[in-house]
């Protein structure tokens, strides 16, 4: 991130606190009930969105000229000091447990892998999966050793471009076409520093970045109040939500066709106006260094909109071949995109 001189209060940077009641799809709304307000709730929301993308295998969108086809996988980066509540993001991982259990497919790719091992796992998982790390210690060592190779993989993943590697030692060739990998990485500023060392290569502009600037306040509800034999409310809730999401995954898989996400003409014009305005503000503050983040944020925003729309589709009906973004989800993706831009600065 660039050190910003913009005068922003903490409240200005929050996402969930600025959402209206019931603005999110029901599954996300319920899943967020385990988190307190403020940054903790925001971190959980970004984890939920990143993980839910895997459960929407049929969703697609077009972007750019000429049109490029994108699926909903997000690359998300949370930067936070120690003891700031990053562990809340592990709840997002629970949402995919039913998919793993019902299909026998492995979803998660270990983040503590070398770049070569990461490619092997992607190949083994048929180019689909989630790289998940709430503490980046081991990955940081990988980045220091093979930053260029990791950066190349991330750049290809963002655009779903073919990733390939030839290992000279055993003449092994790996090629992964149309990779659809989501990433949720988090760590302290020192842990993520290797990713930030070269702003000009555009690597960080491919991530939805969220920065926590303060430690958690002490919570006087941390004491154990459960009686022996109780099943925690959170476990029961996430078991049910995981089952619902697993059903949605199978519904899309069985449809055997894709569902394209579109914005209305009015929504497209609103985004154009928003980014013209944002471009003027951030260009004056940061010059050309922020260009890549501004130009890639519309893709990230539309991916978020695609996830929201996919979670709202009625599973009692056949999967549609196209869906127009609702005004409700459009306002949500605009808000999240705007806040993420502020954090990227």
Residue ranges and their predicted role:
Residues 1-345:
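Phosphate-handling catalytic cores of nucleic-acid transaction enzymes
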């Amino acid at each position: 991130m660039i050190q910003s001189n913009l005068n922003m209060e903490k409240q200005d940077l929050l996402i969930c606190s600025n959402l209206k009641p019931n603005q999110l799809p029901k599954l996300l709304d319920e899943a967020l009930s385990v988190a307190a307000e403020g940054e903790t709730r925001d971190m959980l929301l970004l984890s939920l969105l990143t993980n839910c993308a895997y459960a929407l295998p049929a969703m697609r969108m077009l972007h750019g000229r000429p049109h490029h086809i994108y699926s909903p996988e997000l690359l998300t980066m949370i930067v936070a000091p120690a003891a700031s509540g990053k562990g809340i993001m592990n709840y997002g991982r629970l949402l995919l447990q039913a998919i793993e259990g019902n299909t026998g497919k492995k979803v998660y790719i270990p983040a503590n892998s070398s770049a070569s091992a990461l490619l092997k796992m992607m190949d083994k998982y048929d180019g689909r999966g989630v790289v998940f790390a709430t503490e980046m210690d081991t990955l940081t060592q990988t980045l220091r050793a093979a930053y260029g190779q990791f950066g190349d993989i991330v750049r290809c993943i963002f655009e779903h471009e073919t990733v390939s590697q030839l290992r000279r030692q055993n003449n092994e060739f790996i090629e992964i076409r149309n990779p659809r990998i989501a990433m949720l990485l988090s760590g302290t500023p020192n842990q993520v520093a290797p990713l930030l060392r070269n702003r000009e290569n555009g690597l960080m502009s491919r991530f939805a970045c969220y920065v926590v600037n303060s430690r958690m306040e002490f919570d006087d509800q941390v004491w154990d109040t459960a009686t022996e034999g109780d099943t925690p409310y959170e476990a029961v809730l996430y078991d049910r939500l995981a089952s619902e999401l697993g059903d949605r995954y199978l519904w899309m898989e069985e449809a055997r066709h894709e569902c394209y996400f579109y914005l209305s003409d009015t929504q497209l014009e609103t985004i154009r106006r928003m980014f013209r305005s944002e471009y003027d503000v951030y260009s004056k503050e940061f010059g050309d260094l922020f260009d890549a983040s501004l130009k890639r944020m519309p893709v990230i925003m539309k991916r978020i909109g695609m996830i929201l729309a996919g979670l709202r589709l009625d599973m009692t009906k056949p999967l549609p071949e196209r869906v127009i973004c609702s005004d409700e989800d459009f306002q949500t993706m605009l808000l999240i995109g705007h806040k993420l831009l502020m954090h990227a600065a």
